[in-house]
């Protein structure tokens, strides 16, 4: 079965859709084909159809820590945000990949379960959090993830334990293969609901105070080099406020690049490269991007 057969059967398949509608930077070129599967069965059908059509497949979640180049993405783009069910069972939380990690964290808190407080201000999806071992305020996804369920490009469903995912700083095994996170289980500890929710609300308030949430951005742009913090490095190098096109190193938090209006992905990438070049020259440090960069060059 091919993609157009699925469309004829009622699956919502869109063509030539600007991905800037979905990215947190509000930049990015078009998807040749775009689909939002609601179930694992639909996702499997899309994978099989794209394979039949010999189309490349790109899977994304909430697009919060992502830059899509201005030429867009060829083939089929699958956005998982409609696969967003969250269930709490005893001391575990089960969440589909498209669920927001914020919502998953608050579901745990409302159930009096502790361990996901750190994620209360992370805007990404559960799948994205597992994929990159997302973290904040001293916590990381690996600290409480019990297992992750994935589907291969051939439609095989597999489950990995925490240890099998080989987590490290902003990294997991899933960055090295083509498998797609479809769900995750978090093993948490019973705690005092009010205390847990207070901590989550505090971290959210801290995020609002420190981060430039008033502008579109892709979140933290660079990985933290050992022994350094990115924001202070950029300030010391005179880069805070540096702007190329509509992309600017935030004047509120130099670790963020914001869209001040009309920015393109190329503006973002040119500013990233300028920052990397400047820091390499001044400090001898090669900054690595935390943000995922995809699309046609």
Curated annotation (Swiss-Prot):
Q: GO annotations under biological process?
A: cell division; cell wall organization; peptidoglycan biosynthetic process; regulation of cell shape
- Biological or metabolic pathway of the protein: Cell wall biogenesis; peptidoglycan biosynthesis
Q: Where is the active site?
A: 170, 220, 290
EC nos: 1.3.1.98
Gene3D superfamilies linked to this entry: 3.30.465.10, UDP-N-acetylenolpyruvoylglucosamine reductase, C-terminal domain (3.90.78.10), Uridine Diphospho-n-acetylenolpyruvylglucosamine Reductase, domain 2 (3.30.43.10)
> Got any disulfides in this one, which pairs?
none
A Pfam match:
FAD_binding_4
Q: Which PROSITE patterns match?
A: FAD_PCMH (PS51387)
A single Gene Ontology CC term: cytosol
Q: Which cofactor does it need?
A: FAD
Q: What does this protein do?
A: Cell wall formation.
Similarity comment text for this entry: Belongs to the MurB family.
Family annotation (NCBIfam families):
murB, PRK13905.1
State the name under which the record lists this protein.
Answer: UDP-N-acetylenolpyruvoylglucosamine reductase
Name its species.
Lactobacillus delbrueckii subsp. bulgaricus (strain ATCC 11842 / DSM 20081 / BCRC 10696 / JCM 1002 / NBRC 13953 / NCIMB 11778 / NCTC 12712 / WDCM 00102 / Lb 14)
Classification from the root reads: Bacteria, Bacillati, Bacillota, Bacilli, Lactobacillales
